[in-house]
Design a protein with these regions (language model features):
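Conserved catalytic-core segment of nucleotide-activated headgroup transferases in glycan assembly
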Residues: 48-57, 178-258
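Donor nucleotide-activated moiety binding/catalytic core segment of transferases
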Residues: 81-96, 251-287, 291-292
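Membrane-proximal basic amphipathic "stem/tether" segments
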Residues: 1-38, 42-43
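Short active-site oxyanion
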Residues: 148-153, 246, 274-277
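A short, charged/proline- and glycine-enriched loop
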Residues: 29-38, 62, 114, 207-210, ...
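Tryptophan-centric aromatic hotspots in well-structured domains and transmembrane helices
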Residues: 47, 67, 117-121, 168-172, ...
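Structural loop-to-beta junction motif characteristic of Rossmann-like glycosyltransferase folds
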Residues: 115, 277, 293-297
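Active-site and donor-binding regions of nucleotide-sugar-utilizing enzymes
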Residues: 36-190
Length: 299
């Protein structure tokens, strides 16, 4: 693990454990506002995953909704701190907060009881360790609890509840099998047909070929991700089969900077409609793909 990464973690801990709680406590002088809802994401500049359909459902309900979505990995430190400060000031008066993955400001303080934090966890299942079950996700030296203050964590099935509670150090009953809002779109015939049409317009050379999507996960952590699959010889296999197959390599969002040559204009979800074979390693994308009842290969 690099010295720079470790240094960043310590700076992050100081901000999370000292500065943000101070900002929150000052803002708590004002009461919680009924109907005030926040959607927050520190990895994307727009709503993604389960948050998007939940927002669409709530936006016309007369609620006071605010979005806090930024990719903090791309922000200068001063902007990141300003973003978190603004969030904490509003967090102190929010009735509900929705997040889609780790969002450290939410867990940086002891929140008010009147505020409910809902973690709309993004994956449909697990094929690898996460959270406190792996030191790569949450280093042992990290002081703080990135999953504190969660009142509800939504998961895809009852068999996932105990697994999530163990991995994220949640109280029993916090994880509930309420399903994933984002998977509803997979049953929309018009959406699937539109994705097919756009795909063949973008890749006319894929017509009359079988479509294979290679969508590996990543190893390491979000700050220093890596992937062994792409370097393991799978590209040679693709080359031998390119007469009959059209291959799309869809790397994990954390890996896009490392592999810009594999950029694809379509999200993995949008590719499902045209995919004949999905190849992945231990990515949770396979749980989504199973809805289409098509072939997949773990490599």
């Amino acid at each position: 693990m690099s010295v720079l990464f470790t240094l960043k973690q310590y700076v992050k801990m100081v901000i999370q454990n000292k500065y943000l709680p101070y900002i929150y406590q000052k803002a708590c002088k004002k009461p919680v506002k009924k109907g005030k809802i926040l959607f927050a994401d520190a990895h994307h500049t727009e709503l993604t995953g389960n948050m998007k359909p939940v927002y669409q459902k709530l936006k016309n309900g007369g609620y006071d909704i605010q979005l806090y979505c930024e990719d903090i990995q791309t922000m200068p430190v001063w902007r990141m701190i300003a973003f978190m400060k603004e969030f904490m000031q509003v967090y102190a008066q929010a009735e509900y907060v929705f997040i889609n993955s780790y969002f450290l400001p939410v867990s940086s303080c002891r929140k008010r009881k009147e505020t409910t934090v809902v973690q709309l966890w993004h994956s449909g299942g697990l094929m690898k360790k996460m959270g406190y079950d792996t030191t790569e996700d949450i280093p042992k030296y990290y002081k703080g609890n990135p999953t504190a203050n969660y009142d509800l964590v939504t998961v895809s099935a009852s068999c996932c509840e105990a697994v999530w509670e163990k991995a994220l150090h949640l109280s029993q009953g916090t994880a509930k099998a309420l399903g994933l809002a984002r998977t509803d779109i997979y049953f929309d015939k018009e959406w699937n047909a539109d994705n097919k049409c756009r795909f063949y317009q973008r890749y006319p050379e894929a017509r009359n070929k079988k479509i294979c999507v290679y969508a590996p996960s990543f190893e390491g952590n979000a700050a220093h991700p890596y992937n062994r699959g792409i370097e393991s010889g799978i590209l040679d296999i693709m080359k031998h089969l390119e007469k009959e197959w059209f291959f799309i390599i869809k790397v994990h969002p954390h890996m896009e900077k490392n592999y810009p040559m594999y950029h694809c204009d379509f999200s993995t979800e949008e590719l499902f409609a045209v995919t004949d074979l999905l190849i992945t390693d231990y990515s949770s994308v396979v749980y989504d793909y199973l809805i289409y009842q098509k072939s997949f290969l773990l490599y």
